[in-house]
């Protein structure tokens, strides 16, 4: 399909398709962009960092921390790719002119999105975990692996953690859980505090830009500041890991500002979609028609559900799974007396095992079907506005309002 071509629909209306950008891991981007690979000089898609070869014959390219980097612009990116075609040579990493110049509506390199699942998780996180694991004694490795296997998560986590000894079989989502939630809590008994603090810089940097803007417009700049400190001191704690995937993290703040949070910038969802379509084809084997077919089904289902959203949203929050544990009411009778004058405790007070708050289900300790999940652990704020943590014993309603009884956890 040519750029700016409109699609004529069956009802006679026209629909214009805009091609936003290209996302992929580094080897895939290298091919589609006609760019030098990570073993060459000037291999960054966003800047002109040169790189240094270390290790002699059979060594590696390393991209050490630089205070000032010259970024590629859309004009220089286009001109250098044309020069590469005319001279049949490597021009600052360009080996030719990519067909994406004529296809994408957002000019290169602004439309290039590196897949953080490959760069951050499958490459850099895996590499630092391997080096940390190599530092540990056999007994320490056993204890560390045992702690990871026993790590419990809320019920909406789809995957548990695997031990580092099974790292070859660990998937990207498991590495994400390990990096964001389990690595720092499990390592203090085994690592010096300086190295642990160094790792914390990377974990916090990724967490800040992984989801919503926790710090508003300052989120990306705060994340970059943490990462630059991590990048600058990286050679003190890890050997030969100043590779391209580490350097690409310098540009994550730009990706966050231009394209959104990291949790949305992944190729695995599309890979799963294409894989599913390839196995469950209907009438044709052409991927374009099949993808359109499934997207039409998805749009139809979403449009049908949207008409009920206005009424559903009003009733979705609140307690559920009522229980008949009247023996617990003595803990909350005093509270009931302050908010209600009915004097009928048995009729007014209701005990519940679960509660939906902002479309999220929270469990309590009396919900026995939670198995090994820990959706009863919550952070809450005291009357003074101080953050605290605790376990939800149970939920109850009084005077048509919902409350939770929480056992405070000392930090």
Stretch-by-stretch model annotation:
Residues 1-174, 186-187, 191:
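Domain-level detector for long, ordered catalytic/regulatory cores in large eukaryotic signaling
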